[in-house]
């Protein structure tokens, strides 16, 4: 019996040794592959108005993806911290909540904090500020007009009887509350508005998809008493009706919302409002 066990051990041990060697070799190869530099190029829009004679241009940076987080914002922060401290961009939450880091990445408007880096090392990732906006510096667009338009729709609850304000809750049914889903989640990043050709050419008059979706959000809020007044403010030819349902807005929204549908609903409400007004 002992002889049989000895023979079995002799047969088993060399195989185990060989298997262990193979496993170590595989691990070594994986480690070598992991530590080999993975150099990714980023071409980033640069312009500094404080530099006399400076013109907009693209500047290329190289990042080793082995030493960088997975998101485009990680790469931008690494570039600013370790390579070029003059690179300027907005950022805050890093979780797709605040909308600060909205920019155009590889041809599409999105959030740098939620867009993963394209790991194809043969392709250069191109990063621009949001299109058709005045640029303050580098990747920072001037959102003054965008915020002024948002302010113009009075994006807050309005009551005609304010005698009970602060004294009681304004209740909603479950069904009434569900109407706001897909609207209130907007983070005002302006990705949708700056992807809209109508907003590119009429941004001074056309409110754009982001602002109109928020206008709709308050129009259908059962607690608000100023739906008709809100509609009346949008009757001119530009504020609402420059939307031609191109739907770039819906395609680019980083939160998966549908501004195009909201605008279509406003147009339907506007038709009903005008009929009611004409028959009055």
From Swiss-Prot:
Catalytic activity, as annotated: a quinone + succinate = fumarate + a quinol; (R)-malate + a quinone = enol-oxaloacetate + a quinol; (S)-malate + a quinone = enol-oxaloacetate + a quinol
Gene Ontology molecular-function annotations: 2 iron, 2 sulfur cluster binding; 3 iron, 4 sulfur cluster binding; 4 iron, 4 sulfur cluster binding; electron transfer activity; metal ion binding; succinate dehydrogenase (quinone) activity; ubiquinone binding
Subcellular location: Mitochondrion inner membrane
Biochemical pathway: Carbohydrate metabolism; tricarboxylic acid cycle; fumarate from succinate (eukaryal route): step 1/1
Binding-site residues for a ubiquinone, renumbered to this chain: 201
Entry's family note: Belongs to the succinate dehydrogenase/fumarate reductase iron-sulfur protein family.
Stretches assigned to the 4Fe-4S ferredoxin-type domain: 176-206
Activity modulation notes: Enol-oxaloacetate inhibits the succinate dehydrogenase activity.
Record lineage: Eukaryota, Metazoa, Chordata, Craniata, Vertebrata
Residue ranges annotated for the 2Fe-2S ferredoxin-type domain, each copy included: 40-131
Binding-site positions, [4Fe-4S] cluster: 186, 189, 192, 253
Function: Iron-sulfur protein (IP) subunit of the succinate dehydrogenase complex (mitochondrial respiratory chain complex II), responsible for transferring electrons from succinate to ubiquinone (coenzyme Q). SDH also oxidizes malate to the non-canonical enol form of oxaloacetate, enol-oxaloacetate. Enol-oxaloacetate, which is a potent inhibitor of the succinate dehydrogenase activity, is further isomerized into keto-oxaloacetate.
EC number: 1.3.5.1, 1.1.5.-
Binding residue positions for [3Fe-4S] cluster: 196, 243, 249
Membrane topology: Peripheral membrane protein
Annotated keywords: 2Fe-2S, 3Fe-4S, 4Fe-4S, Acetylation, Electron transport, Iron, Iron-sulfur, Membrane, Metal-binding, Mitochondrion, Mitochondrion inner membrane, Oxidoreductase, Transit peptide, Transport, Tricarboxylic acid cycle
Pfam family, one: Fer4_17
N6-acetyllysine: residues bearing it: 51, 55
Known cofactor(s): [2Fe-2S] cluster; [3Fe-4S] cluster; [4Fe-4S] cluster
Protein name, entry field: Succinate dehydrogenase [ubiquinone] iron-sulfur subunit, mitochondrial
Binding residue positions for [2Fe-2S] cluster: 93, 98, 101, 113
């Amino acid at each position: 019996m002992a002889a049989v066990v000895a023979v079995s051990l002799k047969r088993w041990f060399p195989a185990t040794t060989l298997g262990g060697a193979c496993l170590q070799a595989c691990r070594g190869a994986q480690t070598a592959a992991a530590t080999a530099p993975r150099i990714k190029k980023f071409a980033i829009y640069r312009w500094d108005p404080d530099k006399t004679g400076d013109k907009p241009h693209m500047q290329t940076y190289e990042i080793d993806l082995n030493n960088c987080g997975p998101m485009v914002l990680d790469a931008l922060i690494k570039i600013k911290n370790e390579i070029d401290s003059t690179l300027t961009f907005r950022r805050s939450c890093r979780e797709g909540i605040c909308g600060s880091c909205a920019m155009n990445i590889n041809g599409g408007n999105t959030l740098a904090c939620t867009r993963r880096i394209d790991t194809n090392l043969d392709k250069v990732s191109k990063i621009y500020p949001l299109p058709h906006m005045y640029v303050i510096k580098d990747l920072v667009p001037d959102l003054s007009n965008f915020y002024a338009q948002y302010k113009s729709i009075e994006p807050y609850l309005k009551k005609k009887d304010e005698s009970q304000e602060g004294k009681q809750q304004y209740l909603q049914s479950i069904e009434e509350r569900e109407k706001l889903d897909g609207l209130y989640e907007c983070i005002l990043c302006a990705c949708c508005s700056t992807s809209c050709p109508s907003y590119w050419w009429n941004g001074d008059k056309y409110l754009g998809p982001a602002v109109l979706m928020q206008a709709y959000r308050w129009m259908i809020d059962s607690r608000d008493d100023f739906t008709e007044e809100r509609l009346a403010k949008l009757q001119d030819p530009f504020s609402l009706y420059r939307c031609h349902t191109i739907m770039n807005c819906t395609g680019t929204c980083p939160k998966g919302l549908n501004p195009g549908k909201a605008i279509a609903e406003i147009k339907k409400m506007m038709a009903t409002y005008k009929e009611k007004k004409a028959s009055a």
